[in-house]
Regions:
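Nucleotidyltransferase catalytic core that binds NTPs
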Residues: 1-92
């Protein structure tokens, strides 16, 4: 199964995040929400586990239907890809 990948901190989850995810869901695409495992600070008051729990509750029906997956991802410093990798790069 293929997924549209979204990487973020999601601190806190808000309507802008929902709109972003909904764009792909409306196209019939599955979505994988990756929570960056960032260190707690003023901008990141919630642990990745707390964010995952919050998203799992808010998106319970979509997760249960298999349309959305939520995972914790190690913190990243860049996204790198080669030519012809078999997926689209989409900016919203």
């Amino acid at each position: 199964m293929k997924y549209s990948l979204f990487i973020g901190r999601w601190q806190p989850w808000h309507n802008g995040h929902k709109w972003l995810i909904d764009q792909r869901l409306k196209e019939g695409k599955n979505v994988c929400i990756c929570i960056r495992d960032v260190e707690a600070d003023e901008k990141n008051p919630f642990s990745p586990q707390e964010v995952e729990s919050n998203l799992s509750e808010k998106l319970k029906d979509l997760i249960n239907s298999g349309k959305v997956k939520v995972i914790i991802l190690p913190d990243i410093e860049s996204i790198n890809y080669g030519r012809g990798v078999g997926y689209d790069i989409i900016e919203h």
